[in-house]
């Protein structure tokens, strides 16, 4: 059996073939324009400035991004390479650019003649070849396609009678344009006609510039004996009279007879013969309808027309000029009013936005911690002033995976690792007490004072406090800190499984710790670190020092204060150490960093006893950690010299941390910015906590 004819399938095949054909033609068109430009590039043999550097053959599909090329709908409409000092010849293939409207190649070093193909441009409107080394004869067809103002050829070496004649015509055109510009600057009294088809005119003080775009010349007649225009020249007024020839007069009269039969508003010609009318040349812009309103209409010049001549028609002229002038004045007034209205509305909207932003951030501001629900004394309430946000237990429980990820357990509290929804890691310290009755008022006051103290510290080399959590059912007291993922300094110095620290890393840790202690001691009032040891120095990914503080300091063993009167026994509160104690601890810490020995061990005893013999005899090389392959002797001497001053037994003789930083900085060239972590997750953690709190 034969196959049955399926007209629908045949039509669909034809339709797909048509689409493929159109797409291929479109791509060929795009490729052809790119290759045309490359042919022009091939004829350029000198490009001193590298103007055509991005005209690559491999990138011919993106020719619209080439220098000097302007496209519309992937079609080249303008090629502007003026002043590029290009040398070579003109490519006749440029005429294949079907949408090219402007070709500007002036102020180059192009030679040869103009190709005859340039006369076959489809839509070329402007050609500028000035100031080149072109020669030969200009194609005559090119003079017919483009007018003198749109074909610029001066500054070349063309030959031929037609070329010279065209260049002279172009020069005359420039001279005429210059004269028109001079006339545009001279104010004059011109004649405003009532009707374009009539010659009856009235005096009007204005002058329409001759060189305005789309202007043309009108011959205006009147029945008076003279046509006069008063002009200002060097501060003087004079009258110009123009006397037409007999031929012009006869032509004008025949035109007048024709107009009288076809114009209802035309006035009859005078019975008595009058002298031949005088003609002047005035420029008016092209428009439809009556002439536009002219300014200064009220300042009229006395009529120069004799009484014997017919009077002008002032009524129609007033109708033609005064209402538009008044409309322009009203329009200007309305524009000013609208301008003030728009400015006022914009200012009002801006004020609303500012108020809304302030209200939004005040609403999301950090919540202050309120007094303890069981009741606190006035001194306890005053001691608790902070600005860190309060968090919910459920949020921290989710971040810490039900508090299953334990970093380290201490005497009295446990530290958990958590991850916020944004991926930022945090450390959560939670007290070991699980019942309210076991949490004394002294513990509560110590807890709140700890939050108040740490919330005042905001340094890049400090484990900053970013939140807290307190609930009574179920009972919990927690603090949220930054997380330093690279362990502690103690682990890197004494645990062989941890990554080894070279000399530069150790000096950077020393400087970062010193900068942080100086910042804490210079606060008002000063803040001292509770227990400055190597296990309290945490390291970031780039081995920057982050000084960590003991979150729950009730178990630090500090000496108690003297009892004070009140409802709370102040002797239970630990006394924070003095800044001089931190200076002493920093001296011990520096010896531990450079030697790699424990600060205090049962086998070797105190590090001070071990290091004293080297410090007294200036035998500093034997103090260096054996695992260090290289070190800087000048920096070692500076560290040991500062350590001697920090370890003085008399607290009054110990230097301030500011002096310590200055002495170290003179030798160790590590600034405060270089000692800080390159990437700190603190701000991301705060942002995440604030956003979750607002929702």
UniProtKB/Swiss-Prot annotation:
User: PROSITE patterns, per this entry?
Assistant: PROTEIN_KINASE_DOM
Tissue expression profile of the protein: Expressed in pollen tubes and seedlings.
Q: What class of enzyme is it?
A: transferase
Q: Where in the cell is it found?
A: Cell membrane; Endomembrane system
Q: Which residues lie on this side of the membrane: Extracellular?
A: 30-340
Tell me the null mutant phenotype.
Decreased micropylar guidance and fertilization efficiency.
PTM text? Phosphorylated by MIK1.
**One GO CC term on file:** plasma membrane
Protein kinase domain: residues covered: 363-668
Give the top-rank taxon of the lineage listed in the UniProt record for this protein.
Answer: Eukaryota
**What are the LRR repeat spans here?**
75-98, 99-121, 123-144, 147-168
Segment forming the signal sequence: 1-29
The Phosphoserine modification is found at 652
Ranges in the topological domain labelled Cytoplasmic: 362-695
Classify the protein's membrane topology as the record does.
Single-pass type I membrane protein
List the PANTHER family hit by this protein, alphabetically. Answer: PROTEIN MALE DISCOVERER 1, PROTEIN MALE DISCOVERER 2
Give the similarity note. Answer: Belongs to the protein kinase superfamily. Ser/Thr protein kinase family.
Q: How does it assemble?
A: Homodimer. Interacts with MIK1, MIK2 and LURE1.2. LURE1.2 enhances the heterodimerization of MDIS1 with MIK1 or MIK2.
- The name of this protein is Protein MALE DISCOVERER 1
Its taxonomic path starts at:
Eukaryota, Viridiplantae, Streptophyta, Embryophyta, Tracheophyta
């Amino acid at each position: 059996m034969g196959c049955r004819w399926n007209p629908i399938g045949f039509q669909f095949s034809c339709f797909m073939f048509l689409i493929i054909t159109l797409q291929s033609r479109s791509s060929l068109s795009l490729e052809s324009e790119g290759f045309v430009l490359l042919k022009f590039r091939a004829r350029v043999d000198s490009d001193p400035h590298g103007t055509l550097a991005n005209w690559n053959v491999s990138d011919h599909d993106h020719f619209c991004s080439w220098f000097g090329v302007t496209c519309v709908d992937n079609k080249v409409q303008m090629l502007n390479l003026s002043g590029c000092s290009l040398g070579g010849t003109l490519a006749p293939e440029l005429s294949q650019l079907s949408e090219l409207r402007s070709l500007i190649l002036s102020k180059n070093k192009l030679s040869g003649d103009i190709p005859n193909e340039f006369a076959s441009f489809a839509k070329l409107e402007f050609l500028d070849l000035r100031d080149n080394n072109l020669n030969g004869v200009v194609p005559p067809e090119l003079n017919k396609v483009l007018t003198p103002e749109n074909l610029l050829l001066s500054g070349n070496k063309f030959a031929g009678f037609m070329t010279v004649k065209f260049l002279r015509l172009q020069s005359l055109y420039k001279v005429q344009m210059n004269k028109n510009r001079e006339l545009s600057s001279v104010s004059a009294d011109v004649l405003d006609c009532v009707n374009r088809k009539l010659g009856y005119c009235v005096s009007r003080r204005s002058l329409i510039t001759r060189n305005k775009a789309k202007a043309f010349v009108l011959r205006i007649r009147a029945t008076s004996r003279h046509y006069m225009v008063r002009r200002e020249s060097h501060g003087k007024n004079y009258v110009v009279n123009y006397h037409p020839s007999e031929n012009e007069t006869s032509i004008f009269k025949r035109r007048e007879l024709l107009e009288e039969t076809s114009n209802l508003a035309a006035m009859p010609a005078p019975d008595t013969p009058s002298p031949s009318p005088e003609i002047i040349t005035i420029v008016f812009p092209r428009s439809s309808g009556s002439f536009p309103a002219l300014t200064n209409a009220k300042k009229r010049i006395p009529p120069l027309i004799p009484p014997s001549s017919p009077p002008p028609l002032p009524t129609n002229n007033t109708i033609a000029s005064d209402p538009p002038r008044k409309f322009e004045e009203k329009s200007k007034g309305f524009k000013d009013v609208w301008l003030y209205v728009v400015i006022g509305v914009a200012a009002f909207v801006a004020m609303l936005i500012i108020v809304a932003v302030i209200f939004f951030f005040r609403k999301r501001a950090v919540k202050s911690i309120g007094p303890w629900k069981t009741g606190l004394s006035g001194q306890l309430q005053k001691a608790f002033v902070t600005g860190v946000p309060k968090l919910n237990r459920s949020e921290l429980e989710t971040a810490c995976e039900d508090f299953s990820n334990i970093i380290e357990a201490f005497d009295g509290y446990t530290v958990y690792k958590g991850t916020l929804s944004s991926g930022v890691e945090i450390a959560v310290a939670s007290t070991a007490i699980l019942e309210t009755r076991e949490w004394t008022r002294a513990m509560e006051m110590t807890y709140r004072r700890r939050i108040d103290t740490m919330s005042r510290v905001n340094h890049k080399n400090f484990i900053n406090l970013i939140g807290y959590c307190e609930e009574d059912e179920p009972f919990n007291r927690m603090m949220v800190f930054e997380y330093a993922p690279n362990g502690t300094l103690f682990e890197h110095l004494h645990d062989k499984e941890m990554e080894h620290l070279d000399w530069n890393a150790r000096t950077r840790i020393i400087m970062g710790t010193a900068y942080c202690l100086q910042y804490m001691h210079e606060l008002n009032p000063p803040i001292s670190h509770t227990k400055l040891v190597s296990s309290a120095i945490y390291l970031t990914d780039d081995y920057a020092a982050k000084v960590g503080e003991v979150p729950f300091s009730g178990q630090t063993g500090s000496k108690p204060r003297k009892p004070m009167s009140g409802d709370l026994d102040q002797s239970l509160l630990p006394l924070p150490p003095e800044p001089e104690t931190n200076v002493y601890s920093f001296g011990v810490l520096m010896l531990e960093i450079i030697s790699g020995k424990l600060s205090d061990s049962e086998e070797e005893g105190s590090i001070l006893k071990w290091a004293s013999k080297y410090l007294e005899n200036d035998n500093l090389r034997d103090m260096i950690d054996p695992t260090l392959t290289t070190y800087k002797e000048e920096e070692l001497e500076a560290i040991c010299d500062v350590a001697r001053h920090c370890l003085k037994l008399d607290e009054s003789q110990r230097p301030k941390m500011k002096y310590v930083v200055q002495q170290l900085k003179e030798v160790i060239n590590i600034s405060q910015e270089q000692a800080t972590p390159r990437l700190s997750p603190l701000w991301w953690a705060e942002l995440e906590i604030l956003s979750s709190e607002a929702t």
